[in-house]
Amino acid sequence: MVKSDIEIAQAAEELPITDVAAKLGLTSQDLEPYGYDKAKVNWQAIKRSEENGHLGKLILVTSISPTPAGEGKSTMTIGIGDAINNQLGKKTVIALREPSMGPVFGMKGGAAGGGYAQVIPMEDINLHFTGDMHALTSAIDNLSALVDNYIYQGNELGLDPEKIVIKRGLDVNDRTLRKVTIGQGSKFNGVERPASFQLTVGHELMAILCLSKDIADLKERIGKVLVGYTYEDEPVFVKDLGFQGAIAALLSTALKPNLVQTLEHTPAFVHGGPFANIAHGNNSILSTNLALHLSDYVLSEAGFGSDLGGQKFLDFVSTKLEKKPDAAVVVATVRALKYQAEKSTDHLKEENLDSLKEGFANLDRHMNNVRSYNIPVLVVINKFPTDTEAELDLLKSLIEEQGFPCEIVTAHDEGSKGAKAAAEKIVELADKSDYEIKRSYDLDDDLETKIEKVAKRIYHAADVEYTDKAKDQLVKLKKMGKDKLPVIIAKTQYSFTDNVKELGAPTGFTLHVKGLSLRNGAGFVVVSTGHILDMPGLPKHPAALDIDVDETGKISGLF
């Protein structure tokens, strides 16, 4: 009988977290333990690492457009990282985002890898972990409560209740909270106004946590967060209300990177979790930077496909990290590419070379998008049991015909042994890497130019169309002097377009911009397209229905 992911994780022989830390030259004095198998790294160790003069190679892991069939990007990141560390004997750290509990109990499930390529303790990482998500949710909702109290207690600056732009947050998928009215009833209950909730991972405070370099930077960024506008339409920021210290205090511990291990005891930093469709989609700057100072190779996974997390890492995050990736991995699967052609999961287990050829257009777009940055690229095929030799041979030949190296990886079933060839190739590419990155846009471009360049170069759109609301917001941002900030485009993860049903590699379409939101503390503008939601709902059969716990406290059903 095939073991489930959680059964494999629960049967693992974990090392004490102090032993995992020792692999990186960290002592028990450098850690703030959360039990036996996880810890935060303290500021003393972080500052010492920054002074050691060492900087490892950075490998970005991205993928094709996600599908219900699953791509296994986290599994590939962990498997290849394990192989570099254990098969090649090179000091390696894996850097991943923290899972959000919303998808864990919803449709997507967890984000700790799969099979014999997982980070552990799997249940903790997918649920409460070290409490970072709870700290963020508390900070988000305390900020909103303080703002509403400010209005209730006199509102000296004349903050217009109808122009509050910050939202409340929850780490729960709950569609009923997308639009609410607060303060109903008597004046004793506060000022009545419309409000909204968004998923914690999509809130600006999550982005700030992932971009801050230390507590001083964290506090400064929180102070810059736009709260709303006055009755005279003047912007009001958190620092104008004096709340930045309290909110930073709530996040000061969450800012420290979390250290765990893989099933094969490779060190892993799992820290920060912004979604790539509604935010910037990459783990924290602090954890990646720490990993680079403590190891020779760092694998960092970007959310969703190369058009989302990958593009945002290369155009934005790497500028804040002040390091470009030395190489990139693009993950693909036979069954996901067949889905791009068939648009159904009904027959994905059956051999279909024609569907694979047609669906290859999606991978072709993604791998060429990444190569357009001049970065060396390895394409890996995550092999599934239903893949036929004919399908694997065809896909590998299609990839190599485009001039890309390709390796088939079986880490899900075999652990690091199944990723050795991919590890050897990506290390070779990273070691030889010497290129000048060609980003999608120049930082000096205005917002419209940045949006157009990403839309045309990465999505292959023909045109960009703005609603009247979006046009007004562009004017306001220019008036505020914020029209040169980087852009984070919020778009469906399932398509290069803003239409979830347009699969494959469409061209000649129009990207529809519905609105622009200033994330002043994070230092970017979110560009909303199509019908993207920042508070998901639950499916008809949520994953929660399959999760249980027995009388000993042993959890089952997580994946």
Swiss-Prot record:
Could you tell me which Gene3D superfamilies the record lists for this protein? Domain 2, N(10)-formyltetrahydrofolate synthetase, Formyltetrahydrofolate synthetase, domain 3, P-loop containing nucleotide triphosphate hydrolases
Source organism superkingdom:
Bacteria
Its UniProt entry gives the catalysed reaction(s) as: (6S)-5,6,7,8-tetrahydrofolate + formate + ATP = (6R)-10-formyltetrahydrofolate + ADP + phosphate
What the entry lists under InterPro entries is as follows: Formate_THF_ligase, Formate_THF_ligase_CS, P-loop_NTPase
Query: Which GO molecular function, any one, fits this protein according to its record?
Result: formate-tetrahydrofolate ligase activity
CDD domains on file: FTHFS
Matching PROSITE patterns:
FTHFS_1 (PS00721)
Q: What is its EC number?
A: 6.3.4.3
Q: What class of enzyme is it?
A: ligase
SUPFAM superfamilies membership: P-loop containing nucleoside triphosphate hydrolases
Q: Which NCBIfam families match?
A: PRK13505.1
The UniProt entry, under HAMAP family, shows: FTHFS (MF_01543)
Give the family per the record.
Belongs to the formate--tetrahydrofolate ligase family.
Q: What is this protein called?
A: Formate--tetrahydrofolate ligase
